Curated annotation (Swiss-Prot):
Matches recorded under Pfam families: Spc24
Acyltransferase in keyword set: no
Gene it is expressed from: SPC24
SUPFAM superfamilies hit by this protein: Kinetochore globular domain (SSF143026)
Top-level lineage group: Eukaryota
Source organism of this protein record: Debaryomyces hansenii (strain ATCC 36239 / CBS 767 / BCRC 21394 / JCM 1990 / NBRC 0083 / IGC 2968)
Protein name stated in the entry: Probable kinetochore protein SPC24
Length: 227
């Protein structure tokens, strides 16, 4: 055996090996690898298809949401009534999300409430101040009126004639008598100033010696009754 040629010896050794089982195992491994690669490719393809479908559905849903949340039509008109509502503050809302705009309007309304509350407090303070001033003026008016009435009453008591009584009646009806001695002009005539509350008109009569008491009385009564 050892005297045989090396090539024959090698060939004989190779032929003695059983390689078929190993080859079969290798083929099976290759088949498994191929099947695994095919399964992997199919799985990736399926996932890519599903992903593209989901992307398309997502874009479609986003378009619908944007359309539903878009500020337009009646929404725009209603939002104009909230907050400031001027064109500058509204701007171009056609591309804005309605919920974002509503949040902005909510902030505007809160600011407006604060501003109105401040203005209301200021008005109440002014009204209180004016009421105090009015009360003070009314007290002064009543005091002056009381003094004037006292002077007239004292004059009537001291001069109980018909002229003083008439003057008192006229004053109560809105007639003022201005003495000529109080004027600064050369004309020293007395004046009767008649104010008609209903017509809101005033008349002035310069008392002249040529006018009788009857004429003056009728003139005053006519003016008080609106002519």
């Amino acid at each position: 055996m050892f005297h045989e040629k090396p090539d024959k010896l090698l060939l004989s050794s190779i032929e003695s090996f059983e390689i078929e089982p190993d080859l079969l195992t290798l083929r099976r491994i290759e088949e498994v690898i191929n099947k695994t690669n095919q399964y992997r490719s199919n799985t990736i393809e399926n996932y890519e298809t599903k992903l593209n479908t989901m992307k398309s559905e997502f874009q479609s849903l986003m378009s619908e949401i944007n359309l539903l949340t878009k500020v337009s039509g009646i929404n725009y008109e209603n939002l104009k009534l909230l907050g400031n509502g001027n064109e500058e503050s509204m701007g171009d809302l056609s591309n804005k999300n309605i919920f974002n705009v509503m949040n902005e309007k909510s902030i505007e309304l809160d600011n407006l409430k604060l501003s109105l509350a401040k203005n209301l407090n200021d008005l109440e303070s002014q009204i209180n101040s004016m009421n105090i001033t009015k009360k003070d003026l009314m007290e002064k008016y009543e005091l002056v009126k009381m003094k004037n009435d006292n002077l007239i009453n004292d004059n009537i008591l001291k001069n109980p004639d018909s002229k003083a009584i008439k003057i008192n009646i006229y004053k109560n009806l809105g007639v003022e008598i201005e003495s000529g001695e109080e004027g600064e002009t050369e004309n020293k005539q007395d004046k009767v100033i008649i104010y008609n509350k209903e017509t809101n008109l005033s008349s002035i009569l310069n008392i002249d010696d040529k006018y009788s008491e009857y004429f003056i009385t009728n003139y005053i009564w006519d003016r008080l009754q609106g002519y």
